[in-house]
Curated annotation (Swiss-Prot):
Keywords: Cell membrane, Chloride, Chloride channel, Cytoplasm, Disulfide bond, Extracellular matrix, Ion channel, Ion transport, Membrane, Nucleus, Oxidoreductase, Phosphoprotein, Secreted, Transmembrane, Transmembrane helix, Transport, Voltage-gated channel. It comes from Homo sapiens. Residues 1-88 are annotated as: Required for insertion into the membrane. Detected in placenta (at protein level). Widely expressed. High expression is found in placenta followed by lung and heart. Low expression in skeletal muscle, kidney and pancreas. This is Chloride intracellular channel protein 3. Belongs to the chloride channel CLIC family. Residues 12-90 form the GST N-terminal domain. One of its GO terms (molecular function) is chloride channel activity. The gene is CLIC3. Disulfide bonds join 22-25. In the soluble state, catalyzes glutaredoxin-like thiol disulfide exchange reactions with reduced glutathione as electron donor. Reduced in a glutathione-dependent way and secreted into the extracellular matrix where it activates TGM2 and promotes blood vessel growth during tissue remodeling as occurs in tumorigenesis. Can reduce specific cysteines in TGM2 and regulate cofactor binding. Can insert into membranes and form outwardly rectifying chloride ion channels. May participate in cellular growth control. Residues 68-235 form the GST C-terminal domain. It is an enzyme of class 1 (oxidoreductase). A motif (G-site) lies at residues 22-25. Its EC number is 1.8.-.-.
Amino acid sequence: MAETKLQLFVKASEDGESVGHCPSCQRLFMVLLLKGVPFTLTTVDTRRSPDVLKDFAPGSQLPILLYDSDAKTDTLQIEDFLEETLGPPDFPSLAPRYRESNTAGNDVFHKFSAFIKNPVPAQDEALYQQLLRALARLDSYLRAPLEHELAGEPQLRESRRRFLDGDRLTLADCSLLPKLHIVDTVCAHFRQAPIPAELRGVRRYLDSAMQEKEFKYTCPHSAEILAAYRPAVHPR
């Protein structure tokens, strides 16, 4: 493994250097940091340097993983490849232990997109309620004790875990957290509607993520996220 070269190409920010708005890019960036494997991160400004990928991944969308000289361009396949190739005992497994962790919150981003990009003001409230219901389902999952928690505390009524599957980040978190952060950031700015404090499980989840370098370090600046959504959001 020491001789293998890993290079992750991600979207650059507006300044052309730091990490830009791209939840799939952040997802794989988090996975590699959690694996603890040496890799090179390359930010790509496709506006200023559109040909930078042409030699090994022509026409591909970011993110792209270069494993030695082999280019991989599908985010899900890259994630599966990293989990299979960089596994125990040399690297930690990031697979969740509970199947439900993989699907928790999987409808939140779709509901958010429908709400935030809605051109018809009269539909805003109905679409916002749909988003809140999706967030409430995620909140219920995050607050329900998991099997291993109940094994230690049979009387536990509400989970105290930090992430979807327990107290460590998994692939499920790498997928959901970048999108959930976008939801909170964009709704707060453009609709003055951050994820409600009453959704204690979701707020705890986001707060816990911000304490982890693998999430905090890979996050684009809020200005990057807002700039990406500004053209799609209709003023109210």
